[in-house]
Amino acid sequence: MKKQNTFLRLAVPVLLCGIIVVGCRLSGSRSGFTREERRILFEQDSILYVTVVTDPSDSLILRTPCADLSDKMLKSKDFRLFSEKLKATVQAPWEDGVGIAAPQVGISRRVICVQRFDKEGEPFEVYPNIRIDSLFGAVTLSTEGCLSVPDLRGYVPRREGAVISYTDPETLTRVSETVRDFTAVIFQHECDHLDGILYTDRADSVFFSERSAAERMYYDSLGYYVKPSVLIR
């Protein structure tokens, strides 16, 4: 999910996360991740390519319901790497998001990364096997954008609160939590991705954002949105 307010910026030097991969064997499956999923993780830099609806093969991924991760996967080094790369990707200046879901980087697993505006320091956190158990409160119109839907914004009806549950990757136990306000909106937006739903499916109206389009055009001219060969099918 894109930030609500974005501004065209000059080029910003980016200090990428220092993720160094040495001697990876992509043919192995000890982690539980598939060979294709591991290629996506290991054959790209710290910041992953984000799938977009304007690309036919990307759109198929975005519309595919996601599978849970096994306990084996959650305890693997591959999952830790995946988590770090999700955090790095959503915070990249040319993405500038507040949330991202696994299918947005080409991996159909129930994992999202959300910025917790309701916590001190507003950290980005990763939630595997996430579910929204219930929604509550009034329905309000949220102005939303999406990393995978370039140049557009929409007015989307969302509930003001949500009860979520997810698997703690350390203890492998289910955790339940209540979120409200803008944080709840982000969770609703990202969890929709895991079921193949885009905000445009729920929006009362969608409109072209000149600011978003100008920003994307600028970063596109610098080569930040080139699709890597590992995702070309």
Model regions and ranges:
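Bacterial N-terminal signal peptides
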Residues: 11-21
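Bacterial N-terminal signal peptides that target proteins for export
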Residues: 2-12
